[in-house]
From Swiss-Prot:
Quaternary structure note: Homooligomer. Found as homooctamer in solution, but binds to membranes either as a monomer, dimer, or tetramer, not as an octamer.
An example Gene Ontology CC term for this record: vacuole
Species this protein is from: Saccharomyces cerevisiae (strain ATCC 204508 / S288c) (Baker's yeast)
A Pfam family hit: Mitofissin
Gene: ATG44
GO function terms (MF aspect): lipid binding
Protein's name in the database: Mitofissin
Function: Mitochondrial fission factor that acts directly on lipid membranes to drive mitochondrial fission required for mitophagy. Directly binds to lipid membranes and brings about lipid membrane fragility to facilitate membrane fission and engulfment of mitochondria by the phagophore.
Domain of life (superkingdom): Eukaryota
Summary of the knockout phenotype: Lacks mitochondrial fission anf impairs engulfment of mitochondria by the phagophore even if it does not affect the recognition by the mitophagy machinery as cargo. Does not affect reticulophagy, pexophagy, nor the Cvt pathway that delivers the precursor form of the hydrolase aminopeptidase I to the vacuole.
Length: 73
């Protein structure tokens, strides 16, 4: 696998993990404690990372909600 292929693969994996964390937040209210991070820059990047997951989660729910293949119960 080329370097570009590996980067794409890792990027997609990171987005999936972030989306999973967003789903956990929505369903249980549990979120990572970002206050435990000492580095302010790292804390800001983690907030952005988690917000990306929230956006992907929202988009996925909206797409599935408007699809004929899914129904709400």
């Amino acid at each position: 696998m080329t370097l570009v292929g590996k980067l794409v693969h890792i990027s997609i994996d990171l987005v999936l993990v972030s989306t999973c964390l967003a789903g956990i937040k929505r369903n249980t209210g549990l979120t990572p404690k970002l206050e435990t991070l000492d580095n302010q820059t790292m804390r800001n990047y983690m907030k952005r990372y988690l917000n990306l997951g929230e956006s992907v989660y929202d988009y996925s729910v909206a797409t599935c909600g408007s699809s004929t293949y899914f129904a709400r119960k």
